[in-house]
């Protein structure tokens, strides 16, 4: 896909619970933008509360139906894309995400709107802004079933043995990502780390980053966990399990869902579950920041005013 000289892309990134949604909404309204989600949990249908998806039930935002055939998210009047893409038991590969996101960016630009890429999933973000050339390897169900039986620690050791550089790309705690990396290696016969070469940049991109201090992050995470539980997180998980979705499905294996499943199976008390969710979110923040800190292109902003100034200069 050729680079567009006129297409400008604003990326707003940051770790979980940093305030990306609030900032992106304010900027999007000011600059007539549409938001493309770069969140590996928001892609799943029926995962609303635990994914921190900006829906009415959790955050008092609006979900409007724009046609009988298609549902679009309108959060405070701002269109959101790549939310509710696949069911909980399906996988969206990075190559598939990139294809969908690029299509949305070009559609938004053709409407003379500014595309915003917003989220904390680094793989999604950098596949777009750095135009990663990703091999389109289809899922291998037999291999996945075999690998799924092994603990994450063992799988990660297998991955690093095959590709030492993969430790810089794959989260050692994310079993789903580890299995995907091993799957790609098995299909291509090449190291996973060598299969994400950068192509020619497709867009003129401004990267804005938002983060909180460790103390603020801890408080924000604890507050959000309480809000999720109050909004019905436990009932949401019960409903998903009742519908027949496996606890090992791609969606339910993530933070907020796996802890609640353990609670429902009486492996932990409610207070232990809350503590574990907060701890896992705090660890996620550290892993996300370890990645983002390496990118010197990110302009870290302290407030909305600073972000507006940078965005205004960029769009001009």
What spans do the regions from the language model cover?
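Phosphate/pyrophosphate-binding catalytic cores of soluble transferases and nucleic-acid-acting enzymes
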Residues: 1-316
């Amino acid at each position: 896909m050729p680079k567009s000289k006129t297409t400008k892309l604003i990326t707003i990134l940051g770790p979980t619970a940093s305030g990306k949604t609030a900032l992106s909404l304010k900027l999007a309204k000011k600059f007539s933008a549409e938001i493309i989600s770069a969140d590996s949990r928001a892609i799943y249908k029926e995962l609303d509360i635990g994914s921190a998806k900006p829906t009415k039930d959790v955050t008092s935002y609006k979900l409007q139906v724009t046609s009988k055939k298609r549902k679009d998210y309108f959060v405070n009047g701002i269109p959101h894309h790549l939310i509710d893409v696949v069911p909980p038991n399906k996988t969206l590969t990075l190559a598939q995400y990139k294809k969908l996101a690029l299509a949305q960016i070009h559609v938004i630009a053709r409407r003379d709107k500014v595309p915003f890429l917003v989220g904390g999933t680094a793989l999604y973000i950098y596949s777009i802004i750095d135009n990663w050339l990703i091999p389109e390897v289809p899922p291998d169900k037999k291999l996945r079933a075999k690998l799924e039986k092994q603990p994450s620690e063992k799988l990660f050791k297998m991955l690093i043995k095959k590709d030492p550089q993969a430790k810089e790309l794959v989260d050692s705690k994310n079993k789903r990502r580890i299995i995907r990396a091993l799957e790609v290696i098995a299909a291509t016969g090449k190291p996973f780390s060598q299969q994400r070469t950068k192509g020619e940049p497709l867009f003129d991109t401004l990267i804005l980053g938002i983060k909180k201090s460790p103390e603020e992050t801890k408080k924000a995470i604890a507050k959000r966990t309480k809000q999720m539980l109050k909004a019905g997180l436990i009932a949401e998980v019960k409903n998903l399990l009742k519908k027949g979705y496996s606890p090992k499905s791609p969606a339910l294996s993530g933070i907020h869902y796996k802890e609640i499943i353990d609670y429902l199976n009486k492996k932990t008390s409610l207070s232990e579950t809350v503590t574990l969710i907060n701890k896992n979110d705090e660890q996620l923040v550290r892993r996300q920041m370890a990645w983002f800190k390496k990118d010197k292109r990110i302009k870290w902003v302290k407030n909305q005013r600073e972000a507006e100034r940078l965005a205004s200069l960029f769009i001009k």
